Regions:
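The leucine-rich repeat
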Residues: 22-23, 44, 93, 114-115, ...
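Acidic Gly/Asp/Thr-rich repetitive segments characteristic of extracellular carbohydrate-active
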Residues: 69-74
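Beta-solenoid repeat scaffold
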Residues: 94-95, 99
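Concave beta-strand-loop units of leucine-rich repeat
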Residues: 8-19, 26-41, 49-66, 78-90, ...
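Thr-biased low-complexity repeat/linker tracts and other Thr-enriched repetitive architectures
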Residues: 2-5, 257, 280, 298, ...
Length: 340
């Protein structure tokens, strides 16, 4: 389609094993594209990606390791936007970058590792997605992200180093990362919106030991064949949205021992192997409180004074004791059923 000049939607040219050439010579600046799994040479695909990628003058676009090396050779440490769609299999070293004033996006990259270890701030979003071969991302020095963080569809990703991260001003999503084993967020203090985990089947532990506030919900859902075994957030005090643990069979331990208030519901459903749930500081729940089908032998809600809607504890086959000695106000039904 050499005469095509504009495209109203996304461009996908994917998994065409005999497709060796594409002529879109009149088309420039496509907002969202996926071009992978075809029979194009690396040089032809490089030329096509350069042609189609939208970027401001102060942005860095990396398709090859040489692009990263050339940028670092300039001595620059600040850049507006960084976009990586790496064609080759060499590791990428961008440790020269200290500040990204706009966004960082990494997609469809074949590089096994990317070093951005000295980036301290990202002004907008951090979006790492659909990288089939990427195994490790070093963002060790990253302290602040001004937009959202999303890690999704990275099928080989094992390690993400974000040990210095303190704030994410919007949501933080971690979903469909099949090989991700742990997420250590040892410096994280606040998340502006929802903290969301979905289908990360090898994720053993999520640790955020100094996290104090989540501006939205905390959600773990659909970890049905493994993953999300331990949730360790002992300093979390405020959760504006829901606490939502749903069809995550293999969660065994949840430490939310400082959590005082949940603005929405506490909904724990089909978390079959859950043996330890520490909500010992929880005082108020803004909607319903529901605990269904766990392996808890006790549910101690020793600080709970108010539930704005209903409270139900049911089908917990090992439950021997339920304690809520300070509960004064319950806005709906109280159901304790089939805990046998």
């Amino acid at each position: 389609a050499p005469l095509l000049e504009s495209l109203g939607g996304d461009l996908t040219i994917q998994d065409n094993t005999r497709l060796s050439s594409v002529d879109l010579s009149s088309l420039e600046c496509v907002d969202d594209y996926t071009i992978e799994g075809n029979d194009m040479s690396e040089s032809d695909q490089y030329d096509l990606l350069v042609q189609l990628t939208c970027a401001s003058e102060d942005s860095l676009i990396v398709f090859r390791a040489d692009d990263a090396d050339d940028f670092c050779a300039t001595g620059e440490t600040t850049v507006e936007n960084v976009y990586l769609n790496v064609l080759g299999t060499d590791p990428i070293d961008l440790s020269c970058i200290e500040t990204i004033t706009g966004y960082l996006e990494i997609e469809n990259s074949l590089a096994p590792s990317i070093d951005l270890s000295n980036v301290g701030t990202i002004g907008d979003e951090l979006y790492i997605h659909e990288n089939d071969d990427l195994e490790s991302i070093d963002l060790y020095g990253l302290a602040e992200v001004g937009g959202y963080i999303q890690l999704s569809g990275n099928s080989s990703l094992v390690n993400v180093y974000m040990d210095s991260l303190e704030t994410a001003d919007s949501y933080f999503y971690v979903q469909n990362n099949d090989q991700l084993e742990a997420l250590e967020l040892s410096s994280l203090l606040t998340i502006g919106s929802t903290f969301y985990f979905y289908e990360n089947q090898n994720l053993g532990e999520v640790s955020a030991p100094v996290l104090q506030e989540i501006g939205g919900s905390l959600q773990f859902s659909w970890h049905t064949s493994g993953g999300a075994e331990s949730i360790y957030m002992p300093s979390l005090e405020s959760l504006s949205g829901d606490l939502y643990l749903y069809y995550s069979y293999y969660i065994e331990e949840v430490d939310l021992s400082s959590l005082v208030e949940v603005g929405g519901q506490v909904y724990i459903y089909q978390v079959n192997y859950l043996e330890s749930l520490d909500l010992s500081s929880l005082e108020e729940v803004g909607s319903q409180l529901y605990v269904y089908n766990t392996s808890l032998d006790s549910l101690d809600l020793d600080s709970l004074t108010e539930v704005s809607s209903s409270m139900a504890v049911s089908n917990n086959s090992s439950l021997e004791s339920l304690s809520a000695p300070l509960l004064e106000s319950l806005g709906g039904d109280l159901t304790i059923q089939d805990n046998t």
